[in-house]
């Protein structure tokens, strides 16, 4: 069971390596917060079990995505009590609670990120240091995502009616 694993001061980038995912922002943040462990999942040859162990141990699943339709990895993180740190844009806008969103303009591109870097760093520190207090909110977020976006109940009801 990946939920309830001992958490590390770890931030995960679970996305594919593509320009619109803005890995450069994640890498720059790692240089400014070296006291935390930073994992880019796609640079490793992970089994599913290894991937879920990393999620289970992480405190944050980070996104600065400029393109996203559903964002399964952030949901997976929430299921194992990791903070889904997402921009207030794209599908994240309607899917995630305000507690886990940061202003879209902070990461619209690398230049915008450099202007808002300290604010992002402060938010990461808050999520890491106060993670235990955030767990009830993460549970609420995961339940909301499951009920509204990651269920086929309504689809099956429509098909079978």
Where do the model's predicted regions map?
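Aromatic "clamp/platform" in nucleotide-sugar-dependent glycosyltransferases that forms part
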Residues: 65-66
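Short alpha-helical segment that forms part of, or immediately flanks, the ligand-binding pocket
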Residues: 52, 75-79, 90-94
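Short hydrophobic beta-strand element within catalytic cores of glycosyltransferases
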Residues: 83-86
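A charged, aromatic-enriched C-terminal amphipathic alpha-helix characteristic of glycosyltransferases
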Residues: 107-160
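Conserved donor-binding/catalytic core segment of Leloir-type glycosyltransferases
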Residues: 1-21, 27-31
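Short alpha-helical donor nucleotide-sugar binding micro-motif in glycosyltransferases
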Residues: 52-58
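Short acidic/histidine- and often glycine-rich active-site loop of Leloir-type glycosyltransferases
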Residues: 88-104
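A conserved nucleotide-sugar
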Residues: 23-50, 132
């Amino acid at each position: 069971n990946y939920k309830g694993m001992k958490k590390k001061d770890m931030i995960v980038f679970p996305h594919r390596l593509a320009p619109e995912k803005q890995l450069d922002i994640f890498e720059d943040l790692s240089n400014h917060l070296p006291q935390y462990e930073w994992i880019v999942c796609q640079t490793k040859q992970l089994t599913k079990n290894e991937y879920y162990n990393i999620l289970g141990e992480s405190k944050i699943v980070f996104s600065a995505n400029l393109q996203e339709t559903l964002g399964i990895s952030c949901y997976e993180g929430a299921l194992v009590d990791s903070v889904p740190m997402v921009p207030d844009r794209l599908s994240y806008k309607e899917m995630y609670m305000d507690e886990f969103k940061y202003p879209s303009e902070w990461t619209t591109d690398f230049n915008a990120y450099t202007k808002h870097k300290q604010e992002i760093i402060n938010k990461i520190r808050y999520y890491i240091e106060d993670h235990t207090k955030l767990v009830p909110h993460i549970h609420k977020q995961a339940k909301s995502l499951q009920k509204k976006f990651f269920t086929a109940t309504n689809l099956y009801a429509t098909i079978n009616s």
